UniProtKB/Swiss-Prot annotation:
Cell location: Cytoplasm
Its job: Carrier of the growing fatty acid chain in fatty acid biosynthesis.
PROSITE patterns on file: CARRIER (PS50075), PHOSPHOPANTETHEINE (PS00012)
Protein name, per record: Acyl carrier protein
PANTHER family: ACYL CARRIER PROTEIN, CARRIER DOMAIN-CONTAINING PROTEIN
């Protein structure tokens, strides 16, 4: 597991109040991890803070799974 993947999974677990072991790549925030719309907004904000990026609303709407979040962070993070 890459450093970015581990950081993303930790943030998701903390934001959604689930065990890190439940946060696997294929999981959907809403369907599998019980997130609501406010949770997803807070999750995007936490990812922005962690990786020093700004996620436009149109991109945020596409980040619906753990893997989407990992891929976005890998592509856009500032080293």
């Amino acid at each position: 597991m890459s450093d970015i993947e581990a950081r993303v999974k930790k943030i998701i677990a903390e934001q959604l109040g689930v065990e890190e072991g439940q946060v696997t790549s294929e999981k959907s925030f809403v369907a599998d991890l019980g997130a609501d719309s406010l949770d997803t907004v807070e999750l995007v904000m936490a990812l922005e803070d962690e990786f020093g990026i700004e996620i436009p609303d149109e991109d945020a709407e596409k980040i619906t799974t753990v893997q989407n979040a990992i891929d976005y962070a890998n592509t856009h993070h500032k080293a």
